[in-house]
Regions:
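Solvent-exposed serine/threonine-rich low-complexity stretches and specific carbohydrate-binding patches
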Residues: 109-121
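Bacterial Sec-dependent N-terminal signal peptides
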Residues: 1-26
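Exposed aromatic-hydrophobic patches
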Residues: 124-134
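Long luminal/extracellular ectodomains of secretory-pathway precursor proteins
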Residues: 24-29, 37, 107, 120
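Beta-sheet-rich sandwich/jelly-roll-like modules and their strand-loop junctions
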Residues: 29-104, 147-218
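Short, surface-exposed linear segments at secondary-structure transitions and domain or protein termini
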Residues: 119-126, 167-172
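A glycine-anchored, Pro-Gly-centered beta-turn/N-cap motif
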Residues: 138-140
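Short, aromatic- and glycine-rich surface loops/edge beta-strands on solvent-exposed regions
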Residues: 142-146
Length: 218
């Protein structure tokens, strides 16, 4: 008897969950149907400014959780297809970066499924990250960022006490293990860990968000 009751309850819970999921999918579909593509017009959202020749933004293995990005504005509904950035060089093993877009006013992440990108060691890499879900940005202000999510465990162990190094030791390690980005002369956004708010800085690393402009249905 108890097994029958338990099975019945489980069946009801599954039915409720399925109904809620279907309702949410229907709502999402309706929201997407409320816009139409303006002739498939593609656009790049970028706020990078002028390249600073010879200048770099450097990440080291002790910067796990650190994010760097740019503030962007969408004037019309904008469907995100990919985020692009350039890496000058990488000498850190097994680097994983997380790519994110946040609503500027609340720092709420737009992606429900995080985007992770593995970066091999090497020079001059153009990285293209594509969302695994359909993302439609409503008109407003956003922050697009990349963060150092992870790297080789042995390397992290080597950097575990980096806050105790003197200047010479830090310089030696930084020249051996680093991830370098180009710098552009226009305000960017940085934060040391996900619990902090973003802060403005005078430069950015040239992130670009590519996609399609949409127009509200009248």
């Amino acid at each position: 008897m108890n097994r029958v009751i338990s099975y019945t309850i489980a069946t009801l819970l599954l039915a409720i969950t399925t109904a809620r999921s279907s309702a949410q999918e229907a709502t999402d579909t309706k929201q997407l149907q409320e816009v139409v593509v303006m002739g498939g017009k593609h656009k790049t959202l970028s706020n990078r400014g002028t390249r600073i020749l010879g200048a770099i933004h450097m990440l080291t293995p002790d910067k796990v959780g650190y994010e760097v990005g740019s503030a962007l504005s969408a004037k019309q509904p904008f469907e995100v297809e990919e985020i692009e950035f350039f890496i000058i060089s990488n000498s850190i093993r097994d680097v994983t970066l997380q790519v994110a877009i946040y609503r500027d006013s609340t720092f709420t992440e737009v992606f429900s499924q995080p985007i992770f990108v593995n970066i091999p060691e090497g020079n001059r890499q153009t990285v293209v990250a594509k969302p695994t879900e359909r993302i439609l940005l409503q008109p407003g202000d956003y922050i697009v960022s990349i963060g150092l999510d992870d790297c080789d465990g042995e390397t992290q162990q080597q950097w575990a006490n980096s806050d105790q190094w003197d200047g010479q030791k830090r310089y030696q390690m930084m020249t051996k293990q680093n991830l370098q980005f180009p710098l552009y002369f226009k305000a960017g956004q940085i934060r040391s860990n996900p619990d902090d708010a973003f802060e403005k800085c005078p430069t950015n690393i040239g992130l670009k968000v590519k996609g399609v402009i949409h127009k509200p249905r009248h």
